[in-house]
Amino acid sequence: MAAWVKGGAADVDAAVEAAADLLAASRVPVLAGLSAEVSALRAAYRLAETLGASLDPVSGPSVYAELGALSAGGAMSTTRAETIGRADVILIVGNRPWDGELIAEIAAAAPSRGRAAGSERALLSLGGPQNGAIRHVAYAADAGGLTISLGHLRAFAKGHLAGEAAFADLAKRLFAAQYGVIVYDPEEVGELGAEMLQGLIRDLNESTRFFALTLADPFQGRAAVQLSAWTTGQAPRVGFGRHQPEHDSWRFDSARQIAAGEADAALWLASLPAPRPAWLGSLPTIAIVGEGSQEAAGETAEVVITVGVPGQSVGGALWNDRRGVIAYAEASDPAKTPAETETAAGVLTRIRDRLIEKGVSC
């Protein structure tokens, strides 16, 4: 595995030592990104506890939009398999659900189980790209965007607005469902939009059955939520600066901390692809990144260590969006994986061990 220290090539042992020295000299370190396999996430939380650092996943906007709605009023959710097998009416909100194969897979099937079995499936969209390749009824979003549109739709559904508007027709179609599903991306609609959609789903369930199918972010955010919950009892943005895990989604936003000058060192963990943060390199930083990624270069950070990519060069437990669970992903071609391939968990553990040897602790 390749490694760099201050732009120069180094072996992994030297890079681990440099990373430990950098973190030992910091007062308010941040561990960010967290786009990695579960074992690496676990190692990151252990390292943060040792350092007294805070953690912030790159998936934060999606995670907290969903968690905000959940904490405000709960959620009624379903799975991909249940949607394909049972739903006769599906409302697709926004643009992101049209990316990938989900909508095409839904459109290719008909309800085969439950009360809607044998019915024709109706696909409806609100504020989407009006994809002509898949037959559906499209409703344009208001000029104010998706959040305003969802507010108007819920008002028509509750009877607080009346008339012949398009949203009135959409509300009637939703109430006519035998088993309905709303598909949306929490980050795209935002916390207020997610809360509005869950409220609409509760309203619809007064007379029929309706659920949400929320899209997971592509950066292992849901795995981070689960691991943080069983490790700290809280959501992912936690800090260990006062010897115990404290959750604060605003205070431990890494971009805010770094912009405000609160953090004096950072560790960026991305064994899986993740968008590079604007702050990377603006303060002493360690980058643990997947081999072959754009960030696998000496200029990325003060210390750069490349590791195996889970599901490709190494195995690892990852969020499986199709199944809606954390599942183990084998290396795609283990025969081609060099024996010396480092894992993110292994590197983080070695850094923590060196810090403990140096007497560094929260």
Curated annotation (Swiss-Prot):
It is found in: Cytoplasm. The keyword Cytoplasm applies. GO terms for biological process: formaldehyde catabolic process; one-carbon metabolic process. Pathway: One-carbon metabolism; formaldehyde degradation; formate from formaldehyde (H(4)MPT route): step 4/5. GO terms for cellular component: cytoplasm. Octaheteromer. Part of the formyltransferase/hydrolase complex fhc; composed of FhcA, FhcB, FhcC and FhcD. Although FhcB and FhcC do not possess a formylMFR dehydrogenase (Fmd) activity and have an unknown function, they are required for the stability of the complex. This is Formyltransferase/hydrolase complex Fhc subunit B. It comes from Methylorubrum extorquens (strain ATCC 14718 / DSM 1338 / JCM 2805 / NCIMB 9133 / AM1). The lineage of its organism: Bacteria, Pseudomonadati, Pseudomonadota, Alphaproteobacteria, Hyphomicrobiales.
